[in-house]
Amino acid sequence: MIGTAACSSSATNTQTIRLLTHKQFHLPLDALEEFTAKTGIEVLVFTEEDATSMVSLLEKSSENPVADVVLGIDSLERRRASEKRLVEAYKPIGIENVDVTLLLQDELLTPVSQLAACLNRSKSRYLSLPRRLDELPDKPTRPLEAPDSFSALTDPRHAPTAVVPDPLESRMGLYFLVALERAYPENTAGVEPWPKVLEQMLRSGVEIAPSWEEAWFTRFQPTAQESEDDPRSLTWGSAGMPAVSVRFMPELPEEVDVAVINSGCIKVVNYAGIVRNTPDRRNAGRLLDSFLEPLFQYQVPDRYGSQPARTDILRTEAWKRFGVKAKAIPLDEWRIGPIWEQWLMTWRQVSNEVKSGREPVPPVVTVTIPSQ
């Protein structure tokens, strides 16, 4: 665990509050500095690797907590944090401005951001080239029809153009696995189970990247031509990625070559909470209140395309122009909490089998002919 002081204060007798978060949660440092300037309370930030290791640390230290406030508990860890009573109920100031669909009845955790995780694709790779009126369509050079759902990942035409992050190594990859399970649940009549769909994906040519950053920023090349070496034009991202992709450009372009596939999206929520048994509950509450203030909420969007939990926060110009309001289905956090690690084991088993090069064993069918 790495401990760093996120802010500083010139006061002689500086009060401190301990904040536990993780590397994959974007922490708005300007908002923490403003909190210190207003209150005189210095925020000591401790960082874990991801949401799972962060909640595990809270569980191990529950009798003598290592922090007063926790930030970045996602939908996959919400049940464990609540069920183990690692956090205390608290109703922060400003909660009335939060999207009502994100609120929890037990008030143990406070929503601070939300992510609509979706498939993303190139626009230009699927555009028809202009053709003269006296020209016949050239069938071999006609571009692919644009993918519009998860089923494209098992389509032999689209699978070789897709890259997704590995859920064994990446949180965004884990969200992809959760979305895959939701689209193709096991033990459901008429639905092919997700392990079988995964096998078809891998055998059809879908690439698994070691991280989401590798998948998005390196392998996904929306503007690449088909003649270039193995371009990937279909990947896993979010409804916010078209806006994120122009964040560091000196000027906003007229358009961006990234489209969101508004089908099969899932909504992931990031929460904050007051750590149970904290010796400084009052100041912990003040820090948690600050997470819903406008500056923190305005700065909470991250490289994954997350958005504020509040509904009244002004959008950036990039989001206004390129952001997509996707129809993302909320996760059943109570159901998923105890079983997503089992899905990871199944993913590993299926991917290892495909890597081995072994062909799937066909089922043995026995036919009994009735006697005359």
Q: Could you tell me what each predicted segment is?
A:
Residues 97-101, 115, 195-204, 209-211, ...:
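Periplasmic-binding protein-like
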Residues 328-372:
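Conserved C-terminal helix/tail region of periplasmic/extracytoplasmic solute-binding proteins
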Residues 10-80, 357-369:
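Early extracytoplasmic/lumenal segment of secretory-pathway proteins
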Residues 178-258:
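Ligand-binding pocket segment of bilobal, Venus flytrap-like solute-binding proteins
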Residues 120-125, 181-182, 268-283, 299-303:
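A bilobed periplasmic-binding-protein/Venus flytrap-type ligand-binding module shared by bacterial periplasmic
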Residues 87-94, 107-111, 151-154, 247-266, ...:
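Short beta-strand->loop
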